[in-house]
């Protein structure tokens, strides 16, 4: 009897959904090595492997069988995805074209390391980023440069604006996945894209106000307010939008700081001065990587510092997602300072969820950890922090928390996928 790789769901599913991996037709207690690999849009190779032992019936189910070593160990049904590592050092795992799925190659080989034996069976699994029925619309409205993702069905739907960090450009993968959960989601570019500025001399909230108005005027978006989701600098822009703009019903910050960091944040006649930084505080770590966690100037006066975003002006609830091993900046300290500022002004504490062993780039579920990569502005490879297993678990939970938060405060229904064999 020949070995067979069984995947559930077979063929394809969304990246943020689990896939159940099993092997049948092995010899009783046969030792095997499972390998996973994929290439991103730039051809960069990512790989993971793990060693397993079949049961007495010659079957192997990754939901029941612990990995005996390799890229990970223990009971990790999705380990072959979250443990993927780039062949090229410090290469960040990203999805740039959500219309084309990633193709994961799965192989089962006889025996264990150092050199597994012959190939027993193999399969492909497509991991896509455009959920069934989700509609993708390019947006060029006034100054707004974005992509809108609409869920299947007649609508209208609760709306979210999704903003990324200092890398600029237009990243759509989080917005497209959110649309699969019933949210009309606008992936918004704000610099280094088409005719937008190539750098950030200052952050003008009037541009982001245009995006809010666009969403609320869209017939498929349900008002009266919208949600905001941002990571890193994008999170600080979202916190600023919540503080100054109308019709923001709920805000999620992923490893934001609540501070105007490197450049002023302006809205009409108001301006938040930048806190600033000192590159002399860069630390050189292993392999020539640099650690920038302490380059920002001290937050003198704590929550009263003039570079703090006036988050007490926000009308809707706030969720702060925090990686406790974030090496971009001191996210946990900043989250506590935001909370202190809100309480000092008689406002409710924000919801803060802290994840140990978790770095800066908290992505949708099953994204591999990016422990270090090239920093766009510094042009150096910097440490982002995180430990693979803890970071992966944090991403799974954070995604659930974000969906639940927006469902509660914007309206909507959650969808879950539980694969069964």
UniProtKB/Swiss-Prot annotation:
Keywords from the named record: Fatty acid metabolism, Hydrolase, Lipid metabolism, Peroxisome, Serine esterase
Documented EC number(s): 3.1.2.3, 3.1.2.2
One Gene Ontology biological process: saturated monocarboxylic acid metabolic process
Catalysed reactions listed for this entry: succinyl-CoA + H2O = succinate + CoA + H(+); glutaryl-CoA + H2O = glutarate + CoA + H(+); hexadecanoyl-CoA + H2O = hexadecanoate + CoA + H(+); (9Z)-octadecenoyl-CoA + H2O = (9Z)-octadecenoate + CoA + H(+)
Pathway: Lipid metabolism; fatty acid biosynthesis
Entry-linked SUPFAM superfamilies: alpha/beta-Hydrolases
Tissue: Strongest expression in liver and kidney and weaker expression in placenta, heart, and muscle.
InterPro entries: AB_hydrolase_fold, Acyl-CoA_thioEstase_long-chain, BAAT_C, Thio_Ohase/aa_AcTrfase, Thio_Ohase/BAAT_N
Active site: 232, 326, 360
Pfam family, one: BAAT_C
Positions carrying N6-succinyllysine: 313
Intervals of motif Microbody targeting signal: 419-421
GO molecular function: carboxylic ester hydrolase activity; fatty acyl-CoA hydrolase activity; succinyl-CoA hydrolase activity
Function: Catalyzes the hydrolysis of acyl-CoAs into free fatty acids and coenzyme A (CoASH), regulating their respective intracellular levels. Functions as a peroxisomal succinyl-coenzyme A thioesterase that can also hydrolyze glutaryl-CoA and long chain saturated acyl-CoAs.
Family membership noted in the UniProt record: Belongs to the C/M/P thioester hydrolase family.
Note: Compared to mouse peroxisomal succinyl-coenzyme A thioesterase/ACOT4, the human enzyme has a broad substrate specificity overlapping the activity of three mouse acyl-coenzyme A thioesterases, providing an explanation for the unexpectedly low number of acyl-coenzyme A thioesterase genes in the human genome.
Protein name: Peroxisomal succinyl-coenzyme A thioesterase
Gene name per UniProt: ACOT4
């Amino acid at each position: 009897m020949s070995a067979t790789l069984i995947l559930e769901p077979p063929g394809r599913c969304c990246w943020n959904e689990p896939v159940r991996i099993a092997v049948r037709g092995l010899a009783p207690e046969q030792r095997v090595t499972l390998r996973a690999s994929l290439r991103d849009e730039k051809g960069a190779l990512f790989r993971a492997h793990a060693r397993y032992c079949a049961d007495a019936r010659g079957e192997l189910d990754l939901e029941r069988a612990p990995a005996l070593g390799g890229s990970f160990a223990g009971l990790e049904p999705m380990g072959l995805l979250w443990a993927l590592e780039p062949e090229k050092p410090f290469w960040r795992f990203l999805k740039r074209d959500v219309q084309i799925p990633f193709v994961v190659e799965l192989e089962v080989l006889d025996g264990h390391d150092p050199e597994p034996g012959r190939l027993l069976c193999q399969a492909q699994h497509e991991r896509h980023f455009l959920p069934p029925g989700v509609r993708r619309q390019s947006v060029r409205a006034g100054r707004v440069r974005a992509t809108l993702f609409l869920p299947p069905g007649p609508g209208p739907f609760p709306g979210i604006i999704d903003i990324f960090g200092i890398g600029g450009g237009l990243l759509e993968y989080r917005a497209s996945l959110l649309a699969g959960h019933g949210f009309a989601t606008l992936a918004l570019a704000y610099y280094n894209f088409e005719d937008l500025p190539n750098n950030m001399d200052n952050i003008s909230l009037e541009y982001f106000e245009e995006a809010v108005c666009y969403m609320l005027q869209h017939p498929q978006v349900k008002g009266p307010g919208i949600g905001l989701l941002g990571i890193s600098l994008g999170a600080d822009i979202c916190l600023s939008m919540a503080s100054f703009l109308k019709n923001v019903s709920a805000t999620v910050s992923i490893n934001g700081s609540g501070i105007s960091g490197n450049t002023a944040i302006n809205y009409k006649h108001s301006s938040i001065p930048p806190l600033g930084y000192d590159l002399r505080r860069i630390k050189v770590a292993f392999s020539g990587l640099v650690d920038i966690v302490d380059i920002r100037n001290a937050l003198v006066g704590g929550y009263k510092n003039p570079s703090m975003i006036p988050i007490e002006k926000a009308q809707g609830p706030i969720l702060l997602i925090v990686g406790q091993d974030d090496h971009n900046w001191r996210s946990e300290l900043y989250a506590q300072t935001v909370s202190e500022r809100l309480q000092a002004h008689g406002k409710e504490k924000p919801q803060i969820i802290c994840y140990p062993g978790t770095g800066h780039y908290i992505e949708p579920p099953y994204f591999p950890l990016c422990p270090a990569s090239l920093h766009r502005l510094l042009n150096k490879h910097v440490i982002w922090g995180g430990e693979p297993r803890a970071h992966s678990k944090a991403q799974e939970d954070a995604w659930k928390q974000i969906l639940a938060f927006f469902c509660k405060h914007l309206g909507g229904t959650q969808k879950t996928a539980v694969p069964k064999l």
